[in-house]
């Protein structure tokens, strides 16, 4: 039974791969089309928006500070839970 299952699966895969060989000849991404004037204008750098551009070093530093604060808050919460459990155990004993 397992032999029949394996042969039927392999024959199915072989037949489906033969069907898709022609489709693989065409690129999956399609053809490259040059950008039009409107797209080029939208992608061009705009001088009026330059002051709103985020600076990579500043953003990286801010992310790092946020990560550190998150770790500190989580550690503080864990310590509070630990302290309350120990306090309850001390009262119960």
Swiss-Prot record:
Transmembrane segments: none annotated. It is a peripheral membrane protein. Its main location: mitochondrion. The keyword Endoplasmic reticulum does not apply. Residues 1-30 form a transit peptide. GO terms for cellular component: cytosol; mitochondrial inner membrane; mitochondrion; respiratory chain complex II (succinate dehydrogenase). It comes from the Eukaryota. InterPro entries: SDH7. Pathway: Carbohydrate metabolism; tricarboxylic acid cycle. Keywords: Membrane, Mitochondrion, Mitochondrion inner membrane, Transit peptide, Tricarboxylic acid cycle. The keyword Membrane applies. GO terms for biological process: tricarboxylic acid cycle. It is found in: Mitochondrion inner membrane. Component of complex II composed of eight subunits in plants: four classical SDH subunits SDH1, SDH2, SDH3 and SDH4 (a flavoprotein (FP), an iron-sulfur protein (IP), and a cytochrome b composed of a large and a small subunit.), as well as four subunits unknown in mitochondria from bacteria and heterotrophic eukaryotes. This is Succinate dehydrogenase subunit 7A, mitochondrial. It comes from Arabidopsis thaliana.
